[in-house]
C-alpha cells in the first residue's frame, strides 16, 4: 500500500507551445495516477493545452495572450535566424528579448498563484525563467523540462564552445583546429549582441527588485531533458540532470481521408512538415517544390505529402509565389497548383496526422525542420530525415541527427533543389542500407528510452520528498497554517515569501546536489593543500640548506 504523502504539482508553460507542454503533461499522467494533484499555469489563450488531460484540476493565467499578429511577426523574424551575420544575430537577440519581456508579469502573477493555491512543487518549461525565481522566493522544489541538455551550464572539455550552440562540430574528437576555434569563440564574436540581451534582462529584473541570478556551472534544481543518448551527445552530468526522453504520447489520431487513400496507393512517400511556427520564404518553398518534383520524376519517390501551416500559406500568397513553377516533361507545376492539389502525386494540407504518417510503412523520408518533437517522433518510428533547421534548437538538432546517421542535413540559407533531390536519393536509393540500419538502431534505442517517462515521475517525487525532509519542518500531508484574509483566502502567518511555507531552517543540502557547487574555489581545487605542500617543501629545503651551511663552517 502506498503510504507516501501526496502533493500539488503546478505545471508552468508560457511562451512555449504544445511541443513544450505535451511532454510535461505526459509525465504528469503518471504523477496523477499516483494520487498527486496537477494544476496548470499558462498565458491567456493557451488553456487548451490542458484539454487532453482531464486530470488537470485547475488552470491559472499568469500572463497576457500573444496575439496572432505579434506571434507571426516574432516567428517571421526567427525564421530568418542566422548565426553568421550581424543582422542575423541582432534578430536572434530581438527574438529572445521578445520572449523574455513576458518575465515581469509572469513573475508577479505566478507569485500570486503560489500564494493563492499553495503548490508543493513547480514543474516548469525551460522558457519560464520566472518559475526559477518564484521557486527560489518561496523555497519550493523545482523541476525544469528542456528539449535538450541546457545551455551555458555543465561545460565539458571535449565539447567545444557552448553546448547546444554548435554549428560545425558536436565534440572535439574528430574536429579540426579551425572548427574547434570557431565554436569556442562564438560567444566572444557575438558579445555585442548578447551583452544587449544581458543588459535588458538585468534592467528588467532591477525594476522588479529582483537581484541578478548567480551564474553556476551546474543547475541548482532538477533538470529533465526530453532527449536521449543516441541523439544527445554523451556527457558527464550531475545527479540533478537526467535525459528522460523521448516523451511521446502512447496513442495518436488515426489516419483518415484523404490521407488513408493516398498512402494505400503508394510505397515511397516523402512527408514534408516544418511545424507550426516556421515560415519559409519564397525562395525556400520554390527550391523544395522543384527538388521534390525532380525526385518524383526520377521515380525515387512516388508521392509527396506537404503540411503547410495557414500562416505559411498566407505568406506564399502575399509574396505572389504562386507563379513559381517546376517543369517536368510536358507538364508545368506551380506552387498554386500544388497547394490546390491539382497533381495526383502531391497532397497539400494545413494539418496532417503526423504520428500516423510516420508510423505508416509507405513513409520513406521526412523533410523536417528538426524541431524536438518532430525529430523524436521520426526517430521513434524509424523514418530517416532530410533535416533543415530553421531557428533555435532546430539548428543543433539537425547537426545531431546527421551525426547519428539518420538524416541528411541541408543548410537553409544556401541549399539548392539539386541538393534536396540528392539527399532524398541517398536515403532511398544509393545509401539505403546505411540509413535503414541506423534508423533501426535508433528506433530501438528510442523505444527503450521512451519508458523513462516513469523515471521522470520518480525523480520529481524523489526531489519533492527530499526537499520536504531536509528542512526543520515537514509540510507534506499537513494542513497549511494560516489566517483568514478579507478576500476569504488563506495566508500564512508569515509575510515574506521566503517564509510563506514555514519550513524553518535548512538542515542539509539537496541529496542529488554534488558538493563542489557549495565549495570555495580554493577548497574545490585543493589550492590550500598545494600551498601547504609547497610551503612545507620550501621549509624543508631551507632547513636542509641551513644544515649544509652549518656543517661546512
From Swiss-Prot:
Transmembrane segments: 527-547
Gene Ontology MF annotations: UDP-glycosyltransferase activity
Record: glycosylation sites: 376
Catalytic reaction list: verapyrone B aglycone + UDP-alpha-D-galactose = verapyrone B + UDP + 2 H(+)
The keyword Transferase is assigned to this record: yes
EC number from the UniProt entry: 2.4.1.-
SUPFAM superfamilies: UDP-Glycosyltransferase/glycogen phosphorylase
Sequence similarity: Belongs to the glycosyltransferase 28 family.
PANTHER family registered for this protein in UniProt: EG:EG0003.4 PROTEIN-RELATED, FI06409P-RELATED
Function per UniProt: UDP-glycosyltransferase; part of the gene cluster that mediates the biosynthesis of the depside C-glucoside verapyrone B. Acts as the tailoring enzyme responsible for the C-galacosylation of the aglycone alpha-pyrone precursor to produce verapyrone B.
Protein name listed in UniProt: UDP-glycosyltransferase
Amino acid at each position: 500500500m502506498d503510504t507516501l504523502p501526496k502533493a500539488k504539482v503546478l505545471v508552468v508553460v508560457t511562451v512555449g507551445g504544445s511541443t513544450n507542454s505535451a511532454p510535461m503533461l505526459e509525465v504528469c499522467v503518471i504523477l496523477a495516477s499516483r494520487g498527486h494533484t496537477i494544476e496548470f499555469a499558462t498565458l491567456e489563450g493557451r488553456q487548451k493545452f490542458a484539454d487532453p488531460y482531464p486530470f488537470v484540476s485547475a488552470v491559472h493565467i499568469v500572463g497576457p495572450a500573444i496575439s496572432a499578429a505579434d506571434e507571426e511577426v516574432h516567428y517571421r523574424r526567427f525564421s530568418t535566424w542566422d548565426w553568421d551575420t550581424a543582422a542575423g544575430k541582432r534578430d536572434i537577440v530581438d527574438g529572445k528579448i521578445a520572449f523574455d519581456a513576458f518575465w515581469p508579469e509572469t513573475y508577479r502573477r505566478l507569485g500570486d498563484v503560489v500564494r493563492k493555491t499553495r503548490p508543493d512543487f513547480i514543474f516548469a518549461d525551460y522558457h519560464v525563467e520566472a518559475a526559477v525565481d518564484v521557486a527560489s522566493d518561496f523555497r519550493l522544489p523545482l523541476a525544469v523540462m528542456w528539449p535538450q541538455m541546457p545551455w551555458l551550464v555543465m561545460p565539458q572539455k571535449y565539447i567545444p564552445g557552448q553546448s547546444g550552440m554548435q554549428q560545425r562540430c558536436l565534440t572535439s574528437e574528430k574536429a579540426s583546429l579551425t572548427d574547434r576555434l570557431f565554436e569556442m569563440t562564438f560567444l566572444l564574436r557575438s558579445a555585442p549582441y548578447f551583452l544587449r540581451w544581458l543588459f535588458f534582462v538585468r534592467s528588467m529584473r532591477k525594476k522588479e527588485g529582483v537581484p541578478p541570478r548567480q551564474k553556476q556551472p551546474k543547475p541548482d534544481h532538477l533538470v529533465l531533458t526530453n532527449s536521449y543518448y543516441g541523439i544527445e551527445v554523451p556527457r558527464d552530468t550531475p545527479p540533478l540532470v537526467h535525459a528522460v526522453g523521448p516523451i511521446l504520447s502512447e496513442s495518436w489520431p488515426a489516419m483518415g481521408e484523404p490521407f488513408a487513400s493516398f498512402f494505400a496507393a503508394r510505397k515511397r512517400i516523402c512527408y514534408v512538415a516544418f511545424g507550426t511556427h516556421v515560415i519559409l520564404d519564397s525562395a525556400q518553398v520554390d527550391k523544395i517544390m522543384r527538388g521534390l518534383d525532380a525526385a518524383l520524376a526520377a521515380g525515387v519517390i512516388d508521392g509527396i505529402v506537404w503540411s503547410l501551416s495557414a500562416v505559411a500559406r498566407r505568406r506564399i500568397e502575399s509574396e505572389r509565389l504562386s507563379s513559381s513553377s517546376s517543369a517536368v516533361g510536358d507538364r508545368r507545376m506551380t506552387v498554386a497548383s500544388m497547394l490546390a492539389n491539382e497533381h495526383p502525386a502531391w497532397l497539400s494540407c494545413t494539418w496532417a496526422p503526423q504520428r500516423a504518417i510516420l508510423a505508416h510503412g509507405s513513409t520513406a523520408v521526412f523533410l523536417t525542420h528538426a524541431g524536438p518533437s518532430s525529430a523524436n517522433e521520426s526517430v521513434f518510428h524509424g523514418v530517416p530525415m532530410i533535416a533543415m533547421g530553421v531557428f533555435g534548437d532546430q539548428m543543433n538538432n539537425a547537426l545531431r541527427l546527421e551525426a547519428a546517421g539518420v538524416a541528411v542535413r541541408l543548410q537553409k540559407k544556401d541549399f539548392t533543389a539539386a541538393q534536396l533531390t540528392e539527399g532524398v536519393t541517398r536515403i532511398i536509393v544509393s545509401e539505403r542500407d546505411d540509413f535503414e540500419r541506423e534508423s533501426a538502431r535508433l528506433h530501438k534505442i528510442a523505444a527503450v528510452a521512451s519508458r523513462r517517462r516513469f523515471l521522470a515521475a520518480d525523480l520529481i517525487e524523489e526531489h519533492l520528498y527530499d526537499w520536504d525532509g531536509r528542512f526543520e519542518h515537514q509540510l507534506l500531508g499537513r494542513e497549511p497554517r494560516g489566517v483568514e484574509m478579507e478576500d476569504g483566502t488563506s495566508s500564512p502567518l508569515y509575510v515574506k515569501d521566503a517564509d510563506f511555507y514555514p519550513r524553518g531552517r535548512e538542515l542539509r543540502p539537496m541529496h542529488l546536489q554534488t558538493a563542489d557547487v557549495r565549495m570555495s574555489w580554493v577548497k574545490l581545487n585543493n589550492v590550500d593543500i598545494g600551498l601547504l605542500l609547497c610551503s612545507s617543501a620550501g621549509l624543508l629545503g631551507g632547513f636542509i640548506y641551513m644544515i649544509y651551511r652549518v656543517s661546512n663552517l
